[in-house]
Amino acid sequence: MNKQNLINQFAQLITEQPNPRSVNLDQMSALEIVQLMNKEDQQVPLVIAKALPEIAVVVEKIVAAFRQGGRLVYLGAGTSGRLGVLDASECPPTFGVNHEMVKGIIAGGEQAIRYPVEGAEDNQQAAIVDLQAIQLCSKDILVGIAASGRTPYVISGLKYAKEIGSFTVAIASNPQSAMAKIADMSIETIVGPEILTGSSRLKSGTAQKLVLNMLTTASMVLLGKCYQNFMVDVQASNEKLVDRATRIIMQATGCERAKAEQTLTQADNNAKLAILMILMDLDKQSAVDLLAKNQDKLRQTLD
């Protein structure tokens, strides 16, 4: 693409426009700045609300993929890539899943999580190499994330994923984006211009984080990774999480702390298993077998 076409393309992006409400940003006090930011941020959940039907459909696609042994893969550059990596990294400790089930890929690799990597978002071939490195396949779902909706790295990844038969999703903060035209589904989060012109780590980034929260949390809930509203598959890998698992057992069963701690130990720190052992008065192996017969869903097992 020649320089003039690029200039014209960028000029049309909502995320690159100046915000009329922040033209005097450099003259504001600290309180005025944070008040304006807070007011602008209040628009974000309202924008997300308009995209809930699309988000729900994507959740159902993710659940179906998980049940077939597929993975959820996030692909992005800069802030968008970091948010994908963040959401993916939270799934194992929160839901007890392996690190391969949800993956975050950022343009420029691991270094780009902490430092900007020059030219990474424009490297189209790198996206293909990165997806081939994790052996992306037709069972997987690829979610491309970019506020602009036109990041070359992400567009290239979406095209490659479609070629091999993966279901593809685009998350962008500009309407009718180039990414949306490629992907099977699009989630548009049109939050408008940022108070600091072009700084899409602000409202656009917040919108992306909210959407990613929904995609993984709702998917894991539908897979049976919670009971009532407790994260019963939490990996009790430190003191805080052991205490959380203990409290979850107490709240779900009504038992005393000593009983919860004892059963959690017997269940090898598996809160879901401990709850079932207490509520149905089972030994560990019987509880394991019963859960297995009910797709590892505690609610279904108890009902």
From Swiss-Prot:
Organism: Histophilus somni (strain 129Pt) (Haemophilus somnus)
A GO term for molecular function: ether hydrolase activity
UniProt pathway annotation: Amino-sugar metabolism; 1,6-anhydro-N-acetylmuramate degradation; Amino-sugar metabolism; N-acetylmuramate degradation; Cell wall biogenesis; peptidoglycan recycling
Further information: A lyase-type mechanism (elimination/hydration) is suggested for the cleavage of the lactyl ether bond of MurNAc 6-phosphate, with the formation of an alpha,beta-unsaturated aldehyde intermediate with (E)-stereochemistry, followed by the syn addition of water to give product.
Keywords: Carbohydrate metabolism, Lyase
Protein name, entry field: N-acetylmuramic acid 6-phosphate etherase
Subunit details: Homodimer.
Chain ranges of the SIS domain: 62-225
Reactions catalysed: N-acetyl-D-muramate 6-phosphate + H2O = N-acetyl-D-glucosamine 6-phosphate + (R)-lactate
EC number: 4.2.1.126
HAMAP family from the UniProt entry: MurQ (MF_00068)
SUPFAM superfamilies to which the protein is assigned, alphabetical: SIS domain
One annotated GO biological process: N-acetylmuramic acid catabolic process
Enzyme class (EC, first level): lyase
